[in-house]
Amino acid sequence: MRTGRIERNTAETRILIEVNLDGRGNYDVSTGIGFLDHMVEQFSKHSLIDVTMKVDGDLHVDQHHTTEDSAIALGQALGEALGDKAGIGRYGQAYSPMDETLSRVALDISGRPYTVFRAGFSQEKLGEWDTELIEHWFQSVAQAAGITLHIELLYGTNNHHICESIYKGFARAMRQAVELDGRKGGAIPSTKGQLGG
């Protein structure tokens, strides 16, 4: 079973993350930020990656540390669960419609973190979550997990739909990328014989 577990404790946040790449999309998420919880739950449900995320952060300051640190820990847990990445699909891509909104997500579990985020929001908050932190969340996950990640909003007007479309697209692309392909016989999916660098 491909699992990862990260405990990350700082003066700003205390975090426990557990993931199971071969799960069923079960989740237990509590960050203290309701809309972020909702998005991580969407990620788990649509990627079929089981996610436990428990965060006690300094929300009396603002939401930045909780958002960033939970994303870093999630990326680290995903990286731990992937191990040497033998046999994985490596690449994933998804178009994700939600009513009037359509987004596109493409990713490569390459070991070379890079994020392109081309989406904007017309309001400052979704629930109580600052929308400027959405891009930062994806950057932090990709950096910690070693993922090349491209996110593009093709069109859409409703901010909730835009965010949820992106998270669901990320989930579906991750499902493709982490899936084991029996034809590869456990080989590393790179002509270099390794991923990263």
UniProtKB/Swiss-Prot annotation:
User: Does Ribonucleoprotein appear among the keywords?
Assistant: no
What pathway is it annotated to?
Amino-acid biosynthesis; L-histidine biosynthesis; L-histidine from 5-phospho-alpha-D-ribose 1-diphosphate: step 6/9
Q: Name one GO molecular function term.
A: imidazoleglycerol-phosphate dehydratase activity
Q: Which UniProt keywords apply?
A: Amino-acid biosynthesis, Cytoplasm, Histidine biosynthesis, Lyase
Q: What class of enzyme is it?
A: lyase
Instruction: Report the subcellular localization.
Output: Cytoplasm
Q: Which reaction does it catalyse?
A: D-erythro-1-(imidazol-4-yl)glycerol 3-phosphate = 3-(imidazol-4-yl)-2-oxopropyl phosphate + H2O
| Any single GO BP term | L-histidine biosynthetic process
- Enzyme Commission identifier(s): 4.2.1.19
The UniProt entry's GO CC annotations, sorted and at most eight, read: cytoplasm
Protein family: Belongs to the imidazoleglycerol-phosphate dehydratase family.
Protein's name in the database: Imidazoleglycerol-phosphate dehydratase
Q: Which organism is it from?
A: Erythrobacter litoralis (strain HTCC2594)
Write the gene name: hisB
